[in-house]
From Swiss-Prot:
Belongs to the trichodiene synthase family. Pathway: Sesquiterpene biosynthesis; trichothecene biosynthesis. TS is a member of the terpene cyclase group of enzymes. It catalyzes the isomerization and cyclization of farnesyl pyro-phosphate to form trichodiene, the first cyclic intermediate in the biosynthetic pathway for trichothecenes. It serves to branch trichothecene biosynthesis from the isoprenoid pathway. GO terms for biological process: sesquiterpenoid biosynthetic process. The keyword Phosphoprotein does not apply. This is Trichodiene synthase. It comes from Paramyrothecium roridum. Keywords: Lyase. The lineage of its organism: Eukaryota, Fungi, Dikarya, Ascomycota, Pezizomycotina.
Amino acid sequence: MDEFPTEYFLGTAVRLLENVKYRDSNYTREERIENLSYANNKAAAHFAQERQQRILKVNPKRLEASLRTIVGMVVYSWVKVSKELMADLSIHYTYTLILDDSEDDPHNNMLTFFDDLQAGREQKHPWWMLVNEHFPNVLRHFGPFCSLNLIRSTLDFFEGCWIEQYNFHGFPGSYDFPGFLRRMNGLGHCVGGSLWPKELFDEQKHFLEITSAVAQMENWMVWVNDLMSFYKEFDDPRDQTSLVKNYVVCDEISLTQALEKLTVDTLTSSEQMMEVFSDKDAKLMETIECFMHGYITWHLCDHRYRLKEVYEGTMHIETEDAIKFRKFYGQAAKVGAIEHEEWAFPTVAERIEVRLAEEKAAKDGQAVLTSAEPAVPQAAQEVLA
C-alpha cells in the first residue's frame, strides 16, 4: 500500500462518527475559549518555571506546540470537570506527550527507581522528578480508586515509552505484542479514571460503573486515536511503531488487513460503549458521551493530526462517504476550529523571557543596593568583633 487509502479511511471515519451519534454541542464558542485560556495560562506558567526548563531541556517552541495540543484535548474532552482540574490534567498530559516524543534511554536513571520510591527519595529520572512533584495537584481531585488508576496507568505509560525507544514492532507470530504495547502506552486507565472527580461523583456509590468505564475506555480512546492518527503516521518515519504497523509484523498481514482489524475493533468498542452505558445513570452516560464527542472533535480540528488535509482532499470526491465526512468535519470545525492566537498567550517562550528579565532586574537592583551600602570603618569592625 504505497498511496494513502483515502476512500477506505473516509468510510471508516464516517462509520465511527455515526456509531457514536457524533454531535458536539459541549460548549458555546465563548465557553470553549474561556476554558482553553484558563487551562493554557496555568499550564504555560508551570512549564515556564526555571526548574521545569532546567530539568526538561525541551525547546520552548516544541513545548508550546505540545502544550497547545494537550490543552485542546483536555478542554474538548473533559467537558464536565472544573477549570482547575482541566488545568492540572493539561500539565500532567503535557508531561506524557513530552516523554512520548523523547529519544533518551531511561535505563541508567531507573536503576534505583523502587529503592528511591520506597525510601521517599527524589527519583533520578528527570521526568519522574517533575511528574511526581505535580501529581498531588492532580490526585487531590479524585478518590483513592480513581487515583490508583491514574498512578498505575502513568507508570505503565513510562514503560511503554521505554519499549518504543527500540522501534520494535514485535516478533512475527507474537500476536499479543501489539495490544500489549498499545494498552501500556495508551494511558487508557488514566483517562478512564480521570473522568470522575470526587466533586462530581461518589466513586463508592458508582464503583461498578466507574470500573466498567475504565475498562471500556482503555481500548476505545486508544483505538480512536490510532484510527484518527493513521493519516499523519502513514508516511512519517517517527511513527513507525504504530499499532497498525505492529499488526502487520506480528500478525504477518498486509497494511490494508491491519487497518481493517483496527477499524472493526474501534467500531465494536464504540457500539459496546454506547450500549453498556445507555441504561445507566444519566450523569455517567452524559460524561462519557461528551468525552467521546469532544475527543473526536479534538482529533478532527487539532493541527497535529492533519485531518484538514483529508477534508480538503475530498472536495473532488462525490461518494456517499466523502459527502458525509465533509459534513461531519464541517460540524466539528464549526465548534472546534479555534486558532491558537485566540487563547494560547502569552506563550511559554514569552513567559520565560519575562521571567529572565525580572530575575535580571532583581539581581541588578540587589547589586546596586550592595554597592551603595556605606563601608564600616576599621575601628567599628574591631568593636563589633
